[in-house]
Structure formats: C-alpha cells, structure tokens
Amino acid sequence: WVHHMFATGLPPLALAFFSAVSLLITIPSGVQFFAWIVTMWKGKVELTVPMLFTVGFLLIFLLGGITGVMVSILPFDWAVTDSYFIVAHLHYVLNGAVVFPIFGAVYYWMPKMTGKMLNERLGKWSFWVMFVGFNLTFFPMHILGVLGMPRRVWTYSNGLGWDTLSMIASIGSVVFGLGT
C-alpha cells in the first residue's frame, strides 16, 4: 500500500522502489486477466446473467488496472493525489471487482441452492442498469480528478468546470442504485 503514499515525503530511493514494484504488479495481474479471457476464448459462451456480470467485472477490472498503472508513475500520481481520480481508481478496482462477481455468483448459485430459477430478463435488466450506472458514476471522476477536483469535497465554487461531470456522476449513482 506504500504506492498510495507517494506524496507523503518518502525518500527518493523508496519512491523509486515502490514505483517499480507498483508497475511490476501489472505482470501477474495481466497474466491473470488474460487467463480469464483465454478460458472463455474457445468455449461456447452464452450471455446468461452470471456471464454478463463476469464480463462486466472483466471490463471494470481492466479499466481499474489501467488507471493503476497510471498512478504507479510518480509524476502522474503527484498530480492526482487526493483527487477524484484516486476515488475513481479505488472504486473501479475494489467495488467493481467485488460487486459484479458477487451478483453474478448470486444469479448462478441461488437456483442451485433454492431449486427456483431467477428471472433471466430481470437479471439482464439489473446488469445493464448497474453497469451503465457504475460507469456513469465513476468514469467521470477520473476526468474530475485530472481537472483538480479534490476528494472529500462537499461543495465547490462555480466556474471550475466540475458541475456537469459531477452531476453526471450523481445521476449515475442513482442509476446504479436502481440496478441493485
């Protein structure tokens, strides 16, 4: 977790070491990601509700991983530390990579545990509403962070260019909530 502390005054040698290690973690993560893709590659993939949530997880995890590479580079990390970019990265890596597989697992295992099938059509609606809502909520936060919006802000002055993207993120959170 030291790579989240690049702006705390660590010595240059420690910064270089943890930046390199943060970049190196992309290798096993990339292998893991491509192993998931290859697992589906030659199979007959049916886009059932559990598979939709799985593919949604893969896309969200990919974007979280790409932003992780970005924040492992010191100059960029210093520019976006304590901004909405970090909030968006965290939510893509942690929330998206946890919530979507859990929902997929519920849709997969619940019929096996209860003996009653869940409604496939409602499940697909739930997935698409959640997926669109999640990305409407957190993707604009990347841009807001690059524009300088700090995290833990409850209000801000007009004219900073954050209004529209912040409103989109707020609407996205409502959409995401409706999907769950």
Which residue ranges define each predicted feature?
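Hydrophobic cores of alpha-helical transmembrane segments in multi-pass integral membrane proteins
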Residues: 1-6, 17-36, 49-74, 84-115, ...
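Short amphipathic alpha-helical coupling elements at transmembrane boundaries
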Residues: 39-42
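Membrane-interface helix-loop-helix junctions at boundaries between adjacent transmembrane segments
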Residues: 45-46
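Membrane-lumen (extracellular) interface motif
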Residues: 9-12
